[in-house]
């Protein structure tokens, strides 16, 4: 049962400076209207990494870099191997909270390989994230 799995990971979410005040006020929101979005290769979700160099790519060109260190409820993740390609694993349209729950999963874990250097951790419900620390690097 996915509801009983309390598996969490302490992960990194990189964001652009203009987004930080909205995040502090409202938390991370999937597809906010007022934010700069950096892509959705694995569907519309909240993306994290265990690697700062991966998250650094989402901080933009400002000299200051902002990382959120978050407790992320991964529960029982579905596993996807490498870069997204049509016909491989679940489809992008299935990469959402309701579909993953229907097949017994809470999140998506993308394993490195097939050209992907770093793993990615994606949740599709904003209540699965909780900011523990904010790292602001100058």
Feature names for model-found ranges:
Residues 16, 25, 34, 62-138:
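Active-site and NAD+-binding cores of ADP-ribose-processing enzymes
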Residues 1-42, 65:
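ADP-ribose/NAD+-binding catalytic cleft of ART/PARP-like enzymes
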Residues 31-35, 52-57:
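Eukaryotic intrinsically disordered and solvent-exposed regulatory patches
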Residues 43-46, 104:
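Glycine-centered small-residue hotspots that permit tight backbone geometry or close packing
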Residues 16-19, 47, 52-55, 73-77:
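Conserved beta-strand elements of beta-rich interaction domains across eukaryotes
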Residues 23, 58-59:
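A short acidic (Asp/Glu
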Residues 10-13, 45-48, 56, 68:
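Conserved, well-structured core segments
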